[in-house]
Amino acid sequence: MAKIADLTAKTDDQLAQDLGELKREQFNLRFQAATSQLEKPSRVKEVRRTIAQIKTLQTQRAAAAAK
């Protein structure tokens, strides 16, 4: 799981790219779970939380830019 300090150091473009990659990974993990091929079930939780952290950072930055 990514540290929040690592995420805050990234630019908006890097965060958007990471978000896309994580969503693809989440999609693949869902299919692996459905077919009982998932090796690390904890990875689903990690990916979900990292996506939430990135979205939170993007929202905070958008709110700060709007002020």
From Swiss-Prot:
- Provide a Gene Ontology MF annotation, just one: structural constituent of ribosome
Q: Which InterPro entries match?
A: Ribosomal_protein_uL29, Ribosomal_uL29, Ribosomal_uL29_CS, Ribosomal_uL29_sf
Q: Which domain of life is it from?
A: Bacteria
GO cellular component assignments: cytosolic large ribosomal subunit
Name a biological process GO annotation: translation
| Cited SUPFAM superfamilies | Ribosomal protein L29 (L29p) (SSF46561)
* Keywords, in A-Z order: Ribonucleoprotein, Ribosomal protein
Q: Where is the signal peptide?
A: none
Family, similarity comment? Belongs to the universal ribosomal protein uL29 family.
This one is known as Large ribosomal subunit protein uL29
Q: Which organism is it from?
A: Rhizorhabdus wittichii (strain DSM 6014 / CCUG 31198 / JCM 15750 / NBRC 105917 / EY 4224 / RW1)
